[in-house]
């Protein structure tokens, strides 16, 4: 038995998938920015690299805290609005990291960012997969995962261009965290 030719995605399905892919990509972008500038932030705030590494752990620990309320909210009213609010939330929090005056404030902001990360994946993946035709969900869920690698690549390129080439501080990189909100809204 042959496999039927896959139908083109309708605009609603395509847009939902692109929104989820961009959300996941930009989530990874901001998440990996911290890793790329650990040493510089540690120097600026006078903390050890071990304490800096805790920022990553703290961010990940907060994911479940964001996943549950955003998921419940989405089950009540639909996926789009909670996803847009979530992306705006983590974008603004990521941007605020650029203005952190000390390690404690940066840690608090990364904890809040983790809440946004938790909401984004569940909402984006659910929205995309609900809109994708049943017979193509496996294919598109695989493509969706590429977004995280793409986010890391974009973070590395941003680091290279903004930090290494232009010579701007780590704070400028966090200024780029507003991109997800601008793209999604």
Language model region names:
Residues 1-185:
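Transmembrane-helix signature of 12-pass secondary carriers
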């Amino acid at each position: 038995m042959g496999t039927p030719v896959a139908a083109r995605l309708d605009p609603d399905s395509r847009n939902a998938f692109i929104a989820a892919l961009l959300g996941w990509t930009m989530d990874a972008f901001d998440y990996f920015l911290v890793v790329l500038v650990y040493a510089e932030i540690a120097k600026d705030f006078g903390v050890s690299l071990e304490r800096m590494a805790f920022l990553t752990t703290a961010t990940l620990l907060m994911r479940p805290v964001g996943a549950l309320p955003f998921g419940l909210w989405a089950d009540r009213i639909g996926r789009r609005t909670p996803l847009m609010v979530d992306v705006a939330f983590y974008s603004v929090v990521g941007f605020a990291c650029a203005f952190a005056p000390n390690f404690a404030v940066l840690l608090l902001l990364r904890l809040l960012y983790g809440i946004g990360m938790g909401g984004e994946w569940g909402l984006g993946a659910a929205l995309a997969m609900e809109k994708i035709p049943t017979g193509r969900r496996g294919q598109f869920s695989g493509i969706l995962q590429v977004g995280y690698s793409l986010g890391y690549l974009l973070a590395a390129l941003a680091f290279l261009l903004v930090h290494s080439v232009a010579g701007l501080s780590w704070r400028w990189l966090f200024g780029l965290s507003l991109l997800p909100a601008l793209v999604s809204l």
